[in-house]
C-alpha cells in the first residue's frame, strides 16, 4: 500500500557543525560587486585619490573634502541576467532583469573662505547597494543513474544507527555530531541499514531502479550600506575625512529537489526488510541570513601640485551581528503491495542564531 512520511527539521545543525557551515555561507554573501555611481563604475572604482563623487563616501571619506558646493545624486542600475540550466535531457533559459537604486546621496558644503586654513567643511549621507543576490534556476533529468539518497548513505556510513534515532531524552540534532541530512534521511526511511552492520547504509536506488529527478532554486537578498561622512579642505592641499558605515544584510535561499523511482529498494516497517516498490520523495531546504554591521573609515588626500593627488584610506573591520536560520522538510511516499502499514514520524527543533565578526575582506559574515 502507499505510505507517506513527513519529517521536518528546523535549523538542523549540530553545535559543532554550525560554525563551519556558517563561515562558508558567510563567504557567499560577502560584497564583491563593483557598484556605485556611473562615474565610479566607469573608472573601475579607482577613486581613492580622486574624490568628488558620492561613491567615495563608502571608499575614501576624504573625497568629500574635494566638493566645492552641495550635491544631490542618484544612480539607477539595470541588472540584466540570464540563467541557463542544462541536464542530459533538457535545457532551460530564464531571464531575470531588474531595476535597482545602486546609489543615493547628498553632500552639503560650507565654504569658509580662501584666506582660511580650513577652506571648506563638508558633510554627507549616502545609500549604496553593495551586493544583490538574485538567482533562480530549474532543472529536470528524465533518466537518472543514481539517487541523492545513495549519496547520503555513502557519507553516513560509519555512523552508528543508535546515534541517528530519537530517544525520550535524546535529540540527535543537538546531542550528536551527526550530519543533519543523515538524521533527516534515516528517520524518514530514505536511507536504511544494510541488514548486517549497524553503521552501514544504503539508499533507495538499487540495481533495477529507474527514475527521474527535478530541482528548483531561488536566491534573493542584498547587502546595503548607509554612510555618514564628514570632511574638510585644508589650503587646497590636504583633504581629510571620517565616515561611519552601517550595513544591512539579508540573504534567502530556497531549494526544492525531488526524485521519482520505480523498482526502488524500499524498507517495510513490519517485516523490517527491503523490497522493490515505487518511491517518490522531495526535500524543501531553506536558509535565511539577516543582520546588521558597523564600520568606521578614515581617509586623506594629498595634492602637492595641481596634477597630482595621493590618497589613502583605512577601514576598520566590520562588526556584524547575524542571525542564521535554516530548515528542511522531507516528503517521502512509497508503495509496495505488502500488508497495510503506516508511519508518521515528525520532529521539530528550535531555530538558532549566531553572531560573527570580521573585516570587509575576510568577514565571517553560512551555497552549497
Please provide the spans of the model-predicted regions.
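Bacterial Sec-dependent N-terminal signal peptides
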Residues: 1-26
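Generic N-terminal amphipathic/basic segments
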Residues: 7, 23-31, 89-94
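Single-residue recognition of alpha-helix boundary sites
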Residues: 13-15, 71, 247, 317
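Outer-membrane beta-barrel porins/channels
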Residues: 21-35, 40, 109-368
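Outer-membrane beta-barrel translocator/receptor signature
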Residues: 38, 50-59, 65-144, 224
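Short amphipathic alpha-helices and their capping/turn segments at secondary-structure boundaries
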Residues: 62-63, 234
Amino acid at each position: 500500500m502507499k505510505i507517506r512520511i513527513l519529517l521536518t527539521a528546523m535549523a538542523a545543525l549540530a553545535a559543532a557543525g554550525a560554525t563551519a557551515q556558517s563561515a562558508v555561507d558567510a563567504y557567499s554573501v560577502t560584497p564583491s560587486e563593483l557598484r556605485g555611481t556611473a562615474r565610479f563604475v566607469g573608472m573601475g572604482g579607482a577613486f581613492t585619490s580622486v574624490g568628488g563623487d558620492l561613491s567615495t563616501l563608502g571608499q575614501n571619506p576624504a573625497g568629500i573634502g574635494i566638493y566645492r558646493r552641495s550635491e544631490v545624486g542618484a544612480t539607477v542600475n539595470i541588472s540584466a541576467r540570464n540563467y541557463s540550466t542544462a541536464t542530459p535531457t533538457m535545457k532551460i533559459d530564464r531571464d531575470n532583469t531588474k531595476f535597482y537604486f545602486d546609489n543615493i546621496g547628498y553632500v552639503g558644503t560650507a565654504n569658509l573662505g580662501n584666506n582660511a586654513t580650513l577652506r571648506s567643511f563638508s558633510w554627507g549621507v549616502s545609500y549604496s547597494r553593495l551586493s544583490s543576490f538574485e538567482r533562480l534556476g530549474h532543472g529536470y533529468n528524465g533518466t537518472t543513474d543514481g539517487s541523492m539518497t545513495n549519496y547520503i548513505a555513502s557519507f553516513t556510513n560509519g555512523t552508528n544507527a543508535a546515534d541517528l534515532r530519537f530517544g525520550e531524552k535524546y535529540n540527535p540534532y543537538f546531542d550528536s555530531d551527526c550530519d543533519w541530512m543523515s538524521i533527516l534521511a534515516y528517520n524518514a526511511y530514505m536511507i536504511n541499514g544494510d541488514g548486517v552492520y549497524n553503521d552501514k547504509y544504503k539508499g533507495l536506488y538499487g540495481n533495477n531502479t529507474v527514475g527521474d529527478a527535478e530541482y528548483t532554486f531561488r536566491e534573493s537578498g542584498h547587502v546595503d550600506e548607509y554612510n555618514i561622512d564628514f570632511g574638510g579642505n585644508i589650503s587646497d592641499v590636504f583633504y581629510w575625512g571620517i565616515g561611519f558605515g552601517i550595513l544591512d544584510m539579508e540573504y534567502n535561499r530556497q531549494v526544492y529537489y525531488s526524485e521519482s523511482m520505480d523498482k526502488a529498494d524500499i524498507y517495510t516497517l513490519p517485516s523490517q526488510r527491503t523490497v522493490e516498490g515505487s518511491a517518490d520523495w522531495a526535500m524543501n531546504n531553506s536558509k535565511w541570513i539577516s543582520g546588521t554591521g558597523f564600520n568606521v573609515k578614515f581617509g586623506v588626500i594629498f595634492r602637492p601640485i595641481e596634477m597630482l593627488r595621493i590618497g589613502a584610506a583605512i577601514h576598520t573591520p566590520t562588526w556584524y551581528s547575524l542571525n542564521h536560520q535554516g530548515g528542511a522538510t522531507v516528503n517521502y511516499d512509497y508503495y509496495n503491495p505488502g500488508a497495510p502499514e503506516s508511519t508518521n514520524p515528525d520532529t521539530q527543533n528550535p531555530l538558532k542564531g549566531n553572531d560573527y565578526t570580521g573585516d570587509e575582506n575576510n568577514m565571517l559574515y553560512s551555497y552549497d
